[in-house]
């Protein structure tokens, strides 16, 4: 499975620091008017053993690295559990995938970003550039909101397979819904088996 080029897209970053809210609650300020020193000042570090380099909240390594502070959350463990069967048993399956969050302005902890048009525009333009640089075969969204904002740009990448699934931490990951009568977990499992790795052929 390591020859497959897969880009995984989640939804939002979060910040737990109230010091950052004056910046992140104003999109134009966040993207264009905040001095770098202010942004650097609100990047938080969690003290988890000696692996501080993997624990920065805004660093995606905190989510995809085996020792990352967010790695055991359902948002990532539910995805990992389905991916790992396709990669060597002693390997982290996320080593073979790229991943990041669609929205680039953090939300307050556990709150929706409350995105503005500028958030959607910058997020979509950024993802287009990421796709052009990484040239993935598959782009998988674990955020229907993010997918809806990006789907009109799919035509610019005719060789890329795009697919959206429900968020791995929401109730529909394990609960059947829709015309197919499948859970998000089963839909993702079928996609991996039938479309990506062709193990059902």
Predicted segment positions?
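A polyanion-binding, active-site-adjacent surface
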Residues: 1-138
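An acidic- and aromatic-residue-enriched active-site/binding cleft used to recognize and process polar
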Residues: 11-12, 136, 144-145, 167-168
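C-terminal capping/extension of enzyme domains
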Residues: 110-128, 145-201
């Amino acid at each position: 499975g390591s020859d497959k080029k897969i880009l995984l897209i989640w939804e939002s970053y979060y910040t737990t620091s109230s010091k950052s809210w004056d910046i992140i609650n104003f999109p134009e300020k966040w993207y264009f008017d905040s001095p770098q020193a202010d942004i650097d000042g609100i990047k938080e570090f969690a003290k988890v053993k000696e692996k501080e380099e993997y624990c920065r909240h805004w660093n995606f390594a905190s989510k995809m690295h085996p020792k990352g502070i967010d790695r055991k959350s359902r948002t990532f463990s539910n995805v990992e559990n389905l991916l790992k069967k396709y990669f060597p048993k002693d390997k982290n399956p996320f080593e073979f995938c790229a991943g990041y969050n669609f929205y680039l302005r953090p939300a307050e902890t556990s709150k929706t970003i409350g995105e503005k048009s500028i958030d959607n525009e910058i997020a979509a333009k950024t993802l287009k550039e990421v796709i052009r640089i990484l040239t993935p075969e598959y782009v998988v969204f674990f955020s229907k909101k993010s997918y809806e904002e990006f789907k009109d740009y799919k035509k610019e990448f005719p060789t890329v397979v795009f697919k959206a699934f429900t968020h791995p931490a929401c109730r529909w990951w394990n609960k059947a819904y829709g015309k197919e009568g499948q859970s998000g977990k089963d839909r993702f499992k079928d996609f991996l088996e039938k479309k990506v790795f062709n193990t059902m052929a």
